[in-house]
């Protein structure tokens, strides 16, 4: 399991690539000053405290994240390295959610349970502003969820979900791939 410091480094490396197009030291430092940086660090500290069974500290980091960053990430939620909270305001994530590496979340995103079932997110996911992912759905590796989409069904790897309720769209093919597919 990666250390707290290495996980946070990877979070900001990914955020620097997202925001500035590279992961240079300067870009990583700038990424640490962006919206969502405080929420990311508080979430990682909460996760670290939970693994060490430091419940009072875990609760403190959870409540600080909600009060200071308006970001509610359930205490049991697990995300791999490279979590990017583009803007943390209004993010709500159920404590049973599992997410892979390099998950990118915009503001006002809800990832929650429906009748006790929770979503599972793969690696390299993007979730647009205001999107809702609810229930026992799987979001495959490299999938995208459009802004304000309400996802109630699985999104296969590389596909995009848009609309209310969300409709899954296949990935667009580049020019040469389109001709070969025809």
Segments (PLM) and residue ranges:
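Terminal amphipathic alpha-helical/low-complexity segments used for targeting or macromolecular assembly
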Residues: 1-69, 176-182
């Amino acid at each position: 399991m990666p250390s707290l410091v290495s996980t946070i480094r990877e979070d900001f490396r990914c955020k620097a690539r997202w925001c500035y197009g590279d992961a240079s030291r300067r870009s990583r430092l700038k990424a640490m000053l962006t919206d969502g940086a405080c929420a990311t660090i508080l979430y990682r500290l909460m996760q670290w405290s939970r693994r060490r069974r430091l419940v009072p500290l875990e609760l403190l980091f959870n409540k600080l994240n909600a009060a200071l960053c308006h970001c509610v990430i359930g205490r049991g939620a697990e995300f791999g390295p490279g979590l990017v909270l583009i803007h943390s305001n209004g993010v709500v994530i159920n404590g049973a959610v599992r997410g892979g590496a390099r998950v990118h979340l915009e503001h006002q995103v809800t990832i929650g349970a429906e009748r006790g079932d929770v979503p599972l997110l793969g690696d390299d996911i993007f979730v647009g502003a205001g999107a809702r992912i609810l229930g026992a759905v799987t979001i495959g590796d490299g999938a995208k969820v459009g802004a304000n989409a309400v996802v109630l069904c699985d999104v296969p790897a590389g596909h995009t979900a848009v609309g209310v309720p969300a409709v899954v769209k296949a990935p667009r093919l580049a020019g040469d791939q389109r001709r070969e597919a025809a």
